Amino acid sequence: RAGLGSTGPARFRWHVLGPADDIGAVGQGGEGEAVATDALEPLRELTVEALVADELLARRRAEHRSLPLMVVRAETDMAATAHELGTGAAVANLDLGFANLVAASARLGVGAQVLAVVLDYTLEDLTGDPVAYRDGMIALMERITRGMAKAGLARPIFLAAFDCGTQTVTRGPGLEGQWELSWNHGDHRLVFAAPSYAFRVDDTGR
């Protein structure tokens, strides 16, 4: 679900960017390996995160503030559990995404800062165990944090929507595991930004 995008470009097309690898904001989708690059390019399609970046820029312009460059990248794969997600292709490609961000910022002579890492993995988890889901997500956050540290980036804020399922899926290990994760997420900064029922949702929970 996280790899879906709507048609671009962004309103601030030269400020909402992705690595210049001809993949765009949606990432590899677990189908290949990301490539190293120190260049950036405008996005052809807009993920949820790209739309958020575009809105943040619009608000900064309304306040007559400077407009930074915002780099957006989603990475997904076919992991069946949260534990698998933390050891699979998506997180490996995310590591290279962080390295590309640092390389691009160095080329431009500016600093790199990660505003947030968005976690979007609930209905996909097939463990059947809410506690196993929680433990897998904690391990995933630890894996991402360590990867960012290797790239010289600070510990991130993790954002997630509190997934409430769909009209037909109202129970599940991931859905119930969110409650476990909300009160026990280790020493990571995890913020549930909003419940999914606050938004219009399609039949796939998107």
Predicted regions and their residues:
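Cell-envelope and extracellular/periplasmic
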Residues: 1-206
